[in-house]
Curated annotation (Swiss-Prot):
Lineage: Eukaryota, Fungi, Dikarya, Basidiomycota, Agaricomycotina
Keywords: Mitochondrion
Source species: Cryptococcus neoformans var. neoformans serotype D (strain JEC21 / ATCC MYA-565)
Transmembrane segments: none
Biased composition (Low complexity): 103-113
Presence of keyword Mitochondrion: yes
Positions with biased composition (Polar residues): 20-32, 165-179, 202-218
Family assignment from sequence similarity: Belongs to the OXR1 family.
Main localisation: mitochondrion
Mitochondrion is among the record's keywords: yes
InterPro entries the record matches: TLDc_dom
Protein name as catalogued: Oxidation resistance protein 1
BP term (GO), one: response to oxidative stress
């Protein structure tokens, strides 16, 4: 009867395997390094196994800015190679060049006190290491299960590869750096210029450092010379109406505009306005204004009236008669062609006193209205040919009131500094608020609002232009 053999079962095979005779080959002769070496050789020849690829620069930038790793993991394809141990270094086949492009590697997980992290200055670049993702953790766990008892040998080999891989790294950023320092370090990885900016940001220069020398001594501060106020001692021909009136006090440093200098102006014989010519007067005419008086009086005029060296006689009591209407007519004719001309009226009384007024415009008839400006003034001429001006005080604007029956200069409070009737027979002078003048017909200085009458023996009107 033929003997039928039943198919072996898995339990039978397992039993046969357990009952196999002991092998004559001693397994103790194979070291753990040989087992790991055969495993590495298999990975090396496998077409699907590659060295740890350099991450995408764009992904690295996102990782450095602490974005979500899970979102990147979902977009990453599943690995097609068998799990292997967690890489703690760089494989010999993927060791980067000395001047490698920007790449990211992993943090060193070595806890051996005899293996400190290697810090070099290769390339003067700063390369930072991202955290592990979940794929690396799963691969590590699977590899530990497969290697089993070769864990110690793999750890030793990993330490050797770690030291080799750390030689290609530049600097490892401390993991305990504060969040703001890590953010600045991340920005510094782009270019060398960014690294310099990081040093400026993290170590700002003290504002006092720029003022110190290399010895630490402060630089001497440069003091600019302060401009001291200049004392003005010269007289000035320029003055406003207030300054002419004597009631204006100029600010400190104003060029010569002081009341003392304006009121104390004296004519010097060698002045720039020499000589002054008086024209229009006949030789037979008894003069009232002499050339010496004219030179002293010219120094008191406004600047624009000093530009000419020639004065023209418009009216003379000795030449044209005692008529106020004739005076108005002759002045009006001349003013048509000389509208900017000023007029000087000079009187000589029965005691030989000479006095008068200056108007910055022609003396014409204007019924019922005052006219003139602060440049106008009353004056007295001394026997030594000096001029004493009485300028506008600013209290009112009663400079001149000229009508058909009379003409007056200076007014206020019912008093007139100088007033003459139409025939020059009833004339008087008093202290008026407009000029605060002395009584003009008195030899000695006297102020009074009571009018003092005088007899007019001579009268002349001159044009300054």
């Amino acid at each position: 009867m033929p003997h039928h053999h039943s198919l072996p079962t898995s339990s039978a095979d397992f039993g046969d395997f357990n009952s196999a005779p002991a092998s004559s080959i001693q397994t103790s002769s194979l070291s753990q390094d040989d087992l790991l070496g055969s495993y590495d050789e298999t990975i090396r020849h496998s077409p699907s196994v590659k060295s740890h690829p350099s991450p995408d620069p764009r992904a690295s930038n996102l990782d450095l800015l602490f974005l979500d790793h899970n979102a990147e993991e979902h977009r990453r394809p599943e690995p097609t190679y068998s799990p292997r141990s967690r890489p703690t270094g760089v494989l010999p086949e993927s060791v980067p060049h000395a001047r490698s492009p920007r790449r990211l590697s992993t943090f060193s997980s070595s806890t051996s006190p005899t293996s400190p992290p290697s810090i070099t200055d290769a390339g003067c670049d700063i390369i930072f290491h991202p955290f592990y993702d979940h794929m690396d953790v799963n691969a590590t766990r699977a590899m530990q299960k497969m290697q089993g008892h070769g864990e110690r040998g793999a750890s030793k080999r990993s330490d050797k590869m770690q030291l080799r891989g750390q030689a290609s790294h530049s600097r490892i950023a401390p993991s305990s750096s504060p969040p703001h320092s890590r953010l600045l370090d991340t920005l510094a990885t782009t270019t060398k210029l960014a690294s310099k900016w990081r040093s400026v940001i993290t170590h700002p220069t003290s504002p006092n450092t720029a003022d110190q020398t290399h010895n630490g001594q402060p630089k001497p501060q440069i003091r600019h010379a302060e401009t001291s106020p200049m004392d003005i001692t010269h007289d000035t021909p320029f003055a406003s109406a207030e300054q002419i009136a004597g009631s204006y006090i100029p600010p400190t440093g104003a060029p010569g505009f002081t009341q003392a200098s304006v009121l104390g102006m004296k004519h010097h014989g060698d002045g720039p306005f020499e000589p002054l010519t008086l024209i229009g007067r006949k030789d037979s005419t008894s003069n009232v204004l002499t050339p010496e008086d004219a030179i002293g009086l010219k120094a008191c005029l406004p600047p624009r009236q000093r530009l000419t060296n020639q004065w023209t006689l418009l009216f003379s009591l000795d030449q044209h008669g005692a008529s106020l209407s004739t005076l108005y007519r002759l002045i009006d004719i001349y003013s048509v062609s000389h509208q900017s001309s000023g007029n000087i009226l000079v009187i000589r009384d029965g005691h030989g006193n000479r006095f008068g007024t200056y108007m910055n415009e022609p003396i014409v008839k204007r019924e019922g209205t005052y006219y003139g400006s602060g440049e106008s003034f009353l004056f007295k001429l001394t026997h030594s040919c000096q001029t004493i001006p009485y300028r506008w005080t600013g209290k009112n604007k009663y400079f001149a009131l000229c009508e058909a029956g009379f003409m007056s200069f200076g007014g206020g409070a019912g008093a007139y500094g100088l007033i003459l009737d139409s025939t020059f027979t009833h004339n008087s002078s008093a202290t008026c608020p407009a000029y605060n003048n002395d009584i003009l017909c008195e030899l000695e200085p006297l102020k009074s609002q009571h009018a003092q009458s005088f007899q007019c023996l001579g009268l002349e009107v001159w044009s300054t232009l």
